[in-house]
Amino acid sequence: EEALQSGNVDAIAATSMRKTNNERIVDKFDSSDFYVIVKKGNTELLNEINYAIDQMNAVEGDWKTTLYNKNYESIQTKNLEYTEKEKSIISQYSKDNPLHVLCDPTRYPYSYNENGEMKGIIPDYFRKIADYAGISYEFLTPATRDEYIAYQKNKETTDISIDARLETDNYAETKKWGITAPFITMQLARVTRRDFDGKINVVTTVDQTASNSIEDAMAPGAEKLMCSTRQEMMEAVRKGKADAAFVYYYMAQAFVNSDTTGTMTYTLLEQPTFTYRMVVSSTENHALAGILTKAMYAMPQNLVEDLAARYTTYK
């Protein structure tokens, strides 16, 4: 650090857990987990600590980021500057050559197609970071999930998919994709009627292609009622055709808060969770993923929650 401040070196690699002074962050990379260590055999204390962390995860929101921002974040760490090379890449996406953007039209309120316009939490979030970076873009407008999947397979049409759930980073490498940092972690919720007795005999689903679906894990042995969309899944529960539906949290919240019958409720589940990234096509410059990631770091801490409130608040 002294060498950097004195000008003896041009750049250093350092931990993010430090205050910055007269520095410019060029890039962030890699991460390491921190652990609480107890004396070997002290399982009682270990269980208490794990329980406390679970409770914080359940009720304190993104407390890790809150603590980090309180102790380490500064204007310099939040506003990452683009290099000359990155600025050159950004300039390639003009109004005459916009970035073609894809997202699923069947995941209200996360993303949906309304009269030929892509709306929802994820499209709104992308607009924020693309505008911050100065990238011109144009949303593709699939009306159905089948059209969405067809767009996914068409490299000539789709430049970036903004709602990718990847099992591993290695999978992206095999596809020669560029990937951003995660920008949203989705939790599941169980949607039921208020008179639910706790036993799931029939569960709704939209996907039986996976050998081990969410419904298999959450309601083993239950009969599956196939639906076309997740909205239909929750409607089937409201009509008494099924006992439960498992959907992403904001889907459940929006559905229940807009329900005028007062018969529906949802329960937030701690596990499993699903992390989403944006995926740059193999035909585009992968540096674009880093450009968008820098824009993500510059966004307000609670941006996703604030965007979600527009769609999920009781009206």
Model-assigned labels for residue ranges:
Residues 1-10, 49, 60-66, 87-169, ...:
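Extracytoplasmic small-molecule ligand-binding "clamshell" domains
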Residues 1-2, 313-315:
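Short, intrinsically disordered, charge-balanced linker/junction segments flanking boundaries
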Residues 1-40, 108, 123, 127, ...:
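Acidic, polar ligand-binding/catalytic clefts
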Residues 30-84, 120-132, 194-216, 249-253, ...:
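Extended ligand-binding regions for polar small-molecule ligands
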Residues 36, 67-71, 107-112, 118-121, ...:
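Broad hydrophobic/π-residue packing in well-ordered secondary structure
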Residues 62, 138, 223-224, 261-265, ...:
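Secondary-structure boundary/capping residues
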Residues 231-241, 246-250, 255-261, 265-270, ...:
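Intrinsic low-complexity, intrinsically disordered coil/linker regions enriched in small/polar
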